Amino acid sequence: MKTLFLGVTLGLAAALSFTLEEEDITGTWYVKAMVVDKDFPEDRRPRKVSPVKVTALGGGKLEATFTFMREDRCIQKKILMRKTEEPGKYSAYGGRKLMYLQELPRRDHYIFYCKDQHHGGLLHMGKLVGRNSDTNREALEEFKKLVQRKGLSEEDIFTPLQTGSCVPEH
């Protein structure tokens, strides 16, 4: 009986911690800094970005929605992320993309880090995001440390212009 109670209690604690994690990450996030591989074409790097909206769909799934302009057209992108067994790790597009969501000591900041198997190669991209668009030096320093740990160059960090969301034509 004690074993059953312990199992149920641990399961409930795990479920509650997952719910808290989902609540922490949902909402609107402003992109403060980005980094991509050196191989990523300069002309394809996003210079203007909209806020990212993260929604919890239940069952360990999150949806990230954002918009961007391409050839004078507003494009809306939705990415369905499925939680993996590793805390903070999600997969998308049938496992082709792996995303790591890391909360920073400043609770209002996260690092979204993505590995994308694209055209036979592996692309790495990182975003420092916050609940508001204000600059935070501590969060930026943490982002720089992650960039170095992942083997990316601090010189490749750039700050895109924060824009409002555009409205796609349907």
Curated annotation (Swiss-Prot):
Q: Which GO terms describe its molecular function?
A: odorant binding; small molecule binding
| Domain of life of the native organism | Eukaryota
**Alphabetical keyword list:** Disulfide bond, Olfaction, Secreted, Sensory transduction, Signal, Transport
Q: Name one GO biological process term.
A: sensory perception of smell
List the subcellular locations: Secreted
- Give the UniProt tissue specificity note: Strongly expressed in genital sphere organs such as the prostate and mammary glands.
Q: Which family does it belong to?
A: Belongs to the calycin superfamily. Lipocalin family.
Q: What does this protein do?
A: Probably binds and transports small hydrophobic volatile molecules.
- Give the protein name, as stated in the record: Odorant-binding protein 2b
Whichever gene encodes this chain, its name is OBP2B
